[in-house]
Design a protein with these regions (language model features):
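Detector for outer-membrane/organellar transmembrane beta-barrel domains
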Residues: 296-423
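Residues that define the transmembrane beta-barrel architecture of outer-membrane proteins
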Residues: 98-102, 169-174, 223-227, 258-262, ...
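Repeated loop/turn-to-beta-strand initiation elements of outer-membrane beta-barrel proteins
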Residues: 73, 114-118, 185-188, 237-242, ...
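Transmembrane beta-strands of outer-membrane beta-barrel pores
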Residues: 81-87, 114, 124-128, 192-196, ...
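Outer-membrane beta-barrel "beta-signal"
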Residues: 231, 401, 466-496
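Outer membrane beta-barrel
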Residues: 101, 105-241, 247-249, 268, ...
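N-terminal periplasmic/intermembrane-space "pro-region" immediately following the signal or transit peptide
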Residues: 14-96, 107, 111, 115-117, ...
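Residues on the lipid-exposed face of transmembrane beta-strands in outer-membrane beta-barrel proteins
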Residues: 81, 104-110, 175-180, 229-233, ...
Length: 496
């Protein structure tokens, strides 16, 4: 309750934290942001570190001397309330599942001078449609949608038991980092932070530094930060940036030195093309390599990224039988750990054009190849049951088409997005229409509707019906997950 009281007490206007641009993810008009002032040279006759020394025999005013900024602390946050209803096949209107995930972020941003910055962001999560343990009170429900758009198969299956592993509400730490420079040459960011790699819109195989994959159909990135120490070395003369990173909690918290991960990334501007290459080693696991580029090609912007995995990040599963009443779940599948290498690659093109005076639109297409994926949907129940299911990264081939446009009235700050994503391996699809309207300066209203279609049992048109089974001698009641026909969602977001 102390954390809750503290967060609710935080108010005021401030700058947003270092997050991936939600406009770049969702097609809204890009809002210009003021750049932080560049560090200036030390005053003539003074050393850069003179301000850190105390002058004997007299007091000094740190604010007048410029050592501490007058507005050193900023406070702000985000209130984000969503409401999602999913129409399921064969369900009456009164039994239609709903979810109302609430996210409240509060941050403190300290900038005592232009070379030091500290940032902390706490997050409260709550869903009034779930009980205190995060479970629906009736039926299968939609589960926890705090980090999900509910576009694919569920991440867990109803098993007739109550889980007490999640609290509702729940407070989590999103970001907590300190940033400073070493002689204005090397820039250090240490702590729990957001760092996203990759240039593709929907699928980012090179996004190595997060323990979660981004849901591309969410309005903006809701993932929590990860703890790391990042050293950035800009080489402006060569148009190059070099990043060296130590990972502390990816893929798991490092309780020993041997569990730490190390990553290196180099970015370079070559003509009009932006190129990047990275390498990653984590806790004795096989190394991972990646590369990406983006460049103009005539009227189009093209981009691509690829990752090479030295080994499979987890077991590979295959079915060994069909479920029969009373059978043990473990007898229905087998697991193996194949050796690499494995490749994931995505790429696409987009075309920007004016669709009316002062109104822009973007059309694009993207493809994703996933050698770590599966060729059909029959294995999905096993992946969900074992906790190995990864939405948008389970199939072998994916594709997407989209069109996003600014609304006709430039003073109403509206945007529309039409998108279709398909798991080409299992033949399931989802088509979606999104609307966004920013009003009263700080409020954003969101609405969307989507339709699931294609092969039943596929990722985007999932269904599952099983008889009563057992798991290690414990009974598992029959599971019935009907097909979701369509979803309707509303959202209200306040940024302050």
């Amino acid at each position: 309750m102390k954390v809750l009281a503290l967060l609710l007490a935080l108010s005021g206007a401030a700058r947003a934290g270092d997050r991936p641009s939600e406009d770049s993810l969702f097609g809204a008009p890009a809002a210009s942001t003021a750049a932080a002032p560049a560090p200036g040279p030390a005053p003539e006759g003074r050393s850069r570190d003179e301000g850190r020394e105390l002058t004997p025999g007299r007091s000094r005013d740190a604010f007048l001397s410029g050592e501490v900024a007058n507005d050193a602390l900023s406070i702000g946050g985000t209130f984000y309330q969503r409401w999602v209803v999913s129409k399921q096949e064969g369900q009456s209107a009164k039994n239609t599942p709903e979810s109302m995930p609430l996210q409240f972020d509060a941050y403190m941003d300290a900038r005592p001078n232009d070379r030091v910055r500290g940032y902390v962001q706490e997050r409260i999560l709550y869903d009034p449609t779930l009980d205190q343990y995060g479970n629906p009170t009736k039926g299968g429900g939609l589960g926890n949608l705090q980090y999900s758009s509910n576009s694919g198969a569920p991440s867990s299956l109803p098993a007739g038991t109550t889980s007490q592993t999640t609290s509702n509400p729940m407070a989590v730490l999103d970001q907590a980092w300190l940033k400073f420079d070493l002689d204005q040459a090397v820039f250090v960011t240490a702590g729990k932070q957001h760092v996203k790699w990759g240039v593709s819109r929907f699928w980012n195989p090179t996004d190595f530094l997060s323990t979660q994959r981004r849901d591309p159909l969410l309005p903006y990135d809701l993932r929590l930060g990860n703890t790391m120490v990042k050293l950035a070395l800009p080489l402006e003369k060569y148009g190059t940036n070099v990043y060296a990173i130590t990972l502390v909690d990816n893929p798991a918290p490092a309780s020993t030195v041997g569990q730490l991960g190390e990553a290196l990334r180099v970015e370079k501007l070559v003509g009009n093309a932006e190129m990047g290459a990275e390498a990653l080693a984590r806790g004795g696991a096989p190394p991972t390599f990646g590369a990406d580029f983006s460049a103009p090609a005539g009227p189009f912007d093209v981009y691509a990224e690829a990752a090479l995995f030295g080994g499979s990040p987890g077991p590979r599963y295959r079915l060994t039988g069909e479920p029969a009443a009373g059978e043990d779940v473990s007898s229905l599948y087998a697991a193996s750990n194949p050796r690499g290498p494995f490749v994931q690659a995505s790429g696409g093109a987009r075309y920007d054009f004016p669709w009316m005076e002062n109104r822009q639109a973007t059309a694009g297409a993207e493809y994703f190849f996933n050698q770590l994926g599966y060729g059909g949907g029959s294995i999905y129940p096993v992946l969900i049951f074992t906790g190995s299911y990864r939405p948008f990264y389970t199939g072998r081939h994916y594709g997407a088409l989209y069109l996003t446009a600014e609304g006709p009235d430039q003073f109403k700050h509206t945007s529309y997005t039409f998108s279709t994503l398909g798991n080409l391996s299992d033949g399931s699809f989802i088509s979606r229409v999104d609307f966004s309207w920013r009003f009263l300066t700080y409020l954003t209203f969101e609405a969307y509707a989507d339709e699931h279609y294609g092969t039943k049992g596929g990722e985007f048109n999932f269904e599952l019906h099983t008889p009563a089974l057992t798991n290690g001698g414990a009974p598992v009641p029959p599971i019935n997950v009907p097909t979701t026909l369509y979803d309707v969602g509303l959202g209200l977001r306040l940024s302050f």
